[in-house]
């Protein structure tokens, strides 16, 4: 059968089942009907062949079985399926919810934004009308009051005029559409910050709720309510578990209590407990965020007061960023308020799927079943086998993980949501919490925990056998597919909320072990820096010395002839001792010159007559 034809047949079957239920006064959503169709087809006791095309008789049988199960209001299994479908359709993660919430707000404001950005106003009345639309847009986007309240409109208009006078509309109209949208968002943030600051100063704040105070009151109340509901659900689960353990050991009693659907009731309350824990985790995150934002809000307001004080005018570059930060914080408060409201309503609506417990198991019936039974909590069961551990020497092929040898031990995705797979398989559906400290079995890239060491050893002998038993049990009780997170084995029944968690199945364990390494004493040659100083004061002393030298001047004495001199370099040969010797010795003597001048002293006559007399002896006379 082609895919399109098969889809058409399935839609017709779902529509027919819905009409049959409506005829009997039971209004059922198409999602629940579709899930029930898949659950009935999966159940091997109904005799449907997944590989064979459905004939008319098969369709009639399928419709009849689905209608019968959907009209059985005393079946805890039906309530569990409805609870799972409701939670899947109404719960999203914190990040996805806030993203969708902001997207819805943007889509609602799109009409008002387009009226402002697409206008071509020119006349005075048109400009005034445009300004009023901007005020309405600011109020709608900020969520601080109704745009129909005259007091709120006046306050918002006054705040807007202080940063965006009406005279600037002409400039605003000349901007591009994207710039207009950006400026509208920026004006909204600034006006919101101004109104919040005025409210804190006691000068305004009309229509602004005290969100921090509301959240500080709502979060503890919601947390207390969920804690109380969680405690009731856990106590009920502990009682059902104790009764089922008693029944398992008594075959005659098990036959008598088979119509009471004890295990289906246990699955219902366990699923409710898991959903409450999910919601409680989100609310705790909200409480942490609100506590942090409250401190930031007080700090921003105090900074703004210190900046403004009693000044008549403050630069926009100083106050506008603080106004925008205030508005952003207030938007986060609004997000947390909406999220808390949604989670609170979700918790309240989950209680509607617990009605069968009072019908099937009133207090008198429970007291009779609990006669002589010791009710144990999950923690008590874990503590009973706390000292037991799997011995690695007993297993050569299988891999076991322990908290001492695995760094991300608490982050591993345990199969069957942490319940003991062996106990569930051998008792035909009893849910007992696994104890990770005994050891986590890693088998085919999946991780399993057990409530005792004996259960771990038995499961390890033939894991595939017990895994198949659990899968067959899940086919009979379709609510176990989501309760035990068996989506990979039944891909057609993966809920939308679980699709984004597929990556969690691929978390690898980070094992730890003791290793030793040895290196050479000195791989590299030593490099000693003589100028290195470890003393801080010595470094300061050198810094001061350099600073002082920087301010000093060098003096020199130069003359007119020496100021052009420069350094020169010359090269000489080194000195050495040398001796010479001649063949003979000789000497000469020259006569000493003796020349005299007579008559220099003068005489009787006035004229001096000098006579030069050479008395030098001849050379040959010496």
Curated annotation (Swiss-Prot):
Domain of life: Eukaryota
Keyword Cytoplasm appears in the UniProt entry: yes
Family annotation (Pfam families): FAP206
InterPro entries: FAP206 (IPR021897)
CC annotations in GO: axoneme; ciliary basal body; motile cilium; radial spoke
Keywords attached to this entry: Cell projection, Cilium, Cilium biogenesis/degradation, Cytoplasm, Cytoskeleton
Principal location class: cytoplasm
Keyword Cytoplasm: yes
GO terms classed as biological process: axoneme assembly; cilium movement; regulation of cilium beat frequency; regulation of flagellated sperm motility; sperm axoneme assembly
Location of this chain's protein in the cell: Cytoplasm, Cytoskeleton, Cilium axoneme; Cytoplasm, Cytoskeleton, Cilium basal body
PANTHER family registered for this protein in UniProt: CILIA- AND FLAGELLA-ASSOCIATED PROTEIN 206
Function: Essential for sperm motility and is involved in the regulation of the beating frequency of motile cilia on the epithelial cells of the respiratory tract. Required for the establishment of radial spokes in sperm flagella.
Family membership noted in the UniProt record: Belongs to the CFAP206 family.
Name of the featured protein: Cilia- and flagella-associated protein 206
Organism the protein comes from: Rattus norvegicus (Rat)
Gene behind the chain: Cfap206
